[in-house]
Regions:
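Conserved class I S-adenosyl-L-methionine
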Residues: 1-34, 48, 72, 76, ...
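A short acidic, Gly/Pro-enriched loop at the edge of an enzyme's catalytic core
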Residues: 91-102
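C-terminal alpha-helical "lid/dimerization" subdomain adjacent to the S-adenosyl-L-methionine
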Residues: 13-16, 133-190
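A short glycine-rich, Lys/Arg-flanked "PGG" loop and its adjoining helix->strand segment in the class I
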Residues: 116-128
Length: 196
């Protein structure tokens, strides 16, 4: 699997190539957390967001379907005692309805065959009134990193810019979405909406 193969060098690529946007994005997402929040993070990758979210919340469940990525998350978060790290599929979550106050799914929507199914699952497991936070790289198609990742088998399903990212949520009937762009070589647009 592509993501397990690159797990060992993923942070290096991300920090060298896109460190500015990644720092801004992880800091912004972490700022949305509250100390009493129970948070689900899907597609946690190497724990880039996990390590910033966990210290701010009551508990964090970080999931990914790549065991290689989960090993990196475990190592990065080893000093945090309020995090549960486990294998999981964003399109088929094992959690009960209304189990979390917030859910984060960073940089994964563009990889999914059925992103609507994933968002429906996030909506199912987040309590009414809770937040769903979906950061996604924009203008990624033109980037050196996208070309490199695709060459080695990443298989991106879609590419976003500021406009079609907003259209993406509109077509799913999700309203009142706020957007926050974090600039960098691969800028990231953080979409946030309240679960209704």
């Amino acid at each position: 699997m592509f993501w397990s193969r690159i797990a060992g060098i993923y942070d290096l690529i991300e920090n060298i190539y896109n460190g500015k946007a990644n720092r801004q994005t992880t800091d912004y997402v972490a700022s949305l957390m509250g100390k009493d929040d129970s948070v689900l993070e899907c597609a946690c990758g190497t724990g880039m967001f996990s390590v910033k979210i966990a210290p701010r919340v009551k508990d964090l469940t970080a999931t990914d379907f790549s065991d290689g990525m989960l090993k990196r998350t475990s190592k990065k978060c080893r000093m945090l005692n309020n995090i549960n790290i486990e294998n999981g599929d964003i399109t088929d979550l094992r959690f009960e309805d209304n189990a979390f106050d917030k859910a984060v799914a960073a940089n994964v929507i563009h990889l999914l065959d059925d992103p609507k199914k994933a968002i429906d699952e996030l909506k199912r497991v987040v309590k009414p009134g809770g937040q769903i936070i979906i950061p996604t790289y924009i203008h990624f198609k033109e980037s050196t990193a996208a070309n490199l990742f695709n060459k080695f088998g990443a298989n991106f399903k879609r590419y976003f810019d500021e406009n079609n990212y907003k259209d993406f949520f509109g077509k799913m009937g999700i309203e009142n979405v706020s957007y926050h762009v974090c600039e960098g070589r691969m800028s990231c647009d953080v979409a946030v909406f309240e679960n209704v």
